[in-house]
Amino acid sequence: MGEARVESQLAYAGAVSDEPTIRPAYDGSSVAFRALEAWGWGELVNLGYYPLAALPQLVFGMAPFQRRLVERALELLAPAPGERVIDAACGRGGTTSRIARSGAFALGLDLLPENVAEAEARASDEPRPRFAVADVTRLPASAGGIDLDAESFDAVLCLEAGFHFGPKGRRAFLEESWRMLRPGGRLVLVDFVWRDARPERIESLDPDRFVRDTWRFSEFEPLERYRATAREIGFAERAFRDWTRPVIDRFQHIATALARTGDTRAGRALLCALRPGLARIRPDEWRDLVALMRAHGEVRRASRYVAFRLEKPA
């Protein structure tokens, strides 16, 4: 793969190019997204957090597990009444609405206008978050009528989106978060990271680009490079959580089992009885899902899923 092809997959305009390419990951054109949506992706679009004792709840879909992941991220963020909080790459706005219910002013920013429109449609009237289209790696002076002045926010959350930004975009996002935060403010960053210092190894682990082309990213940030960049910008790391096992490890096992079940006639009938939306997936697409989950497994073994709480010193 040439460097130009890799960079063409980067999702955010501020990172490399002027044309965002993230849309195909979330517009229903991939069978992976359609399967996840049928199994419960809705206002929240994250992998979920899977305690062993709660796994029987999977028959009701992914939503309870997605809420658990948001709850853990918000425990780290700890939004308080009267604070101003940015939900960066907010997707359909479910997390932003939860921040608003804490009494904080919540502003959800997303690159895709269709996500912002859906977030606004889903949001309750009271307390109502605000949403706007913006590239969080290159923030404008204002968004949705809200001024984005330096040091005008108390907290920033980025939940399971940084992997889309590309290496340059991740650094730019950290710099933008630093600029937006007041002294003493905090950034909670939840993301996939690469276990070692050689993220280019994904080329050999995902040689057909099944994983990268499905989810529109080039590579995961090495854990220590994330930390080094944050320190260089000025952040102090106040908390770290490794959620690899309850998030990506268990999700991998669950999704692989579902894909293999759907790849048989009897299995498809069972799954469609549980989640009728799965009937829209053709038999050949179930085979594609099996291949995709096999590729995911290779990438997962070289990855971790972590959360940071970074603070801008007062």
What kind of region is each of these model predictions?
Residues G277-A314:
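C-terminal lobe and adjacent flexible extensions of AdoMet/dcAdoMet transferase-like proteins
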Residues F192-F217:
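Short, glycine-/aromatic-enriched active-site segment of Class I SAM-dependent methyltransferases
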Residues A63-P81:
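Conserved alpha-helix/loop element of class I SAM-dependent methyltransferases that forms part
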Residues R5-A53:
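N-terminal, positively charged/glycine-rich alpha-helical extensions of SAM-dependent methyltransferases
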Residues I86, R92-L139:
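Class I SAM-dependent methyltransferase SAM/SAH-binding core
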Residues V211-P276, R287-A295:
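Substrate-binding/catalytic lobe of Class I Rossmann-like enzymes that use SAM or dcSAM, i.e.
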Residues A141-V156:
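A short acidic, Gly/Pro-enriched loop at the edge of an enzyme's catalytic core
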Residues R171-R186:
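A short glycine-rich, Lys/Arg-flanked "PGG" loop and its adjoining helix->strand segment in the class I
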